[in-house]
Amino acid sequence: MNRADIKADKTFDITVADHKFILPSEKMIINTNDKVMFNVTSKDLTYGFGLFREDNTMMFQMQVLPGHNNDILWHFESPGVYTIRSTEYSGPKGIGMIEKNVVEVID
């Protein structure tokens, strides 16, 4: 299967700058079985973009490099609430890069 042939049901554009995630909305709502593209742009440093389950296990992650196209396509197969965290060391402020319960997958 070629990724270029897969059409995303939803796309979320996220910016990262000064150790903060700038989200497109307060909560990103996704329907079960949607394929979602997360486009993440860094304005300054290399960051990580990870999605974590409620039990703190990681669902996926990618590095976010400034000046590059950073995206991930994910198929959400079941409902849940997820937290975004930076998964890359970006200095002492990076430990606070957590956006709790901002992704929700619904039936």
Regions found by a protein language model. Give the residues of each.
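N-terminal edge beta-strand
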Residues: A4-K35
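Detector for Asparagine
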Residues: N2, N31-N33, N39, N56, ...
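Soluble periplasmic/extracytoplasmic beta-strand elements of cell-envelope proteins
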Residues: D13-T15, M37-N39, V102-E104
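A mature extracytoplasmic/lumenal domain signature
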Residues: D18, V40-D44, R53-D55, S78, ...
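Extracytosolic and intramembrane catalytic regions of membrane-associated proteins
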Residues: L23, I29-R53, P79-V81
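Extracellular/periplasmic metallocenter environments
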Residues: M1-A8, M62-D107
